[in-house]
Amino acid sequence: MTAVVRLSIAPVRSLGLEHPDEIDLTPLGVVEDRRFYLVDELGRLVDRLVVGRLVQVAAHTDPGGETLRLAFPDGSVVEGTVSLGDAIETALHGRTAVGHLVLGPWADALEAIAGRRVRLVRTDQPGGTRQGNPASLVSRSSVAELARHAGVEAVDARRFRMLIELDGSAPHEEDAWVGRRIAVGDAILRVTERDARCAITTQDPDSGQRDLDTLRTIIAYRGLMPDATGAPKAMFGVLAAVEQPGRVRPGDRVEVLAG
């Protein structure tokens, strides 16, 4: 039986993951997921491709994005009610995110770990920084298969920052779900495509240091596969659209539906 074993969200894009006991999936994804993100002084996205150690900061927000708590690796905490400043548009991997600058102490606190001037943004539309299909899934058996080909004892699935982590399926069985509908908890998803991976997966999910060439290994045993535009990519896990909103919890079964 294939079932959900872990849920992961990032209230601030590229910062540490949270593992909630349940999520409410909407057509835009999970409203708390990637609700905030960082930009530089020119309004350009600052993520873990730029500063890997951002992952060392833990973040928490409420569904409305009205409060924000950041916990830093030195034990310090910055938290409070979110106040918004000027509107801002940000280029996010071929899309444009619309949001407002966040006033208050968070950006200054993040500068120390980022090593550069950054500004914090709250997106105007929950789920607005997700790439098209807001639900992402990967199985533990797929991650174990990657570890086998990489010649390491284990690979931490958090490298892939997937919303839904599964167990009980064969390695890369989720690939066969592309074009199919699946029931996950109370939600129904349509799996639309494999997930094209980037260099963030080469970073340790706790430190942000590059320590494993995941992309080379994926390409070596799976080859390059075309993305939605036909460009060859290293694919790992799948993306899905939310056809029926619903609640998802660890332990929920995953069922491939007819039609």
Residues covered by each model-derived region:
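Metal-cofactor-dependent catalytic cores
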Residues: 1-259
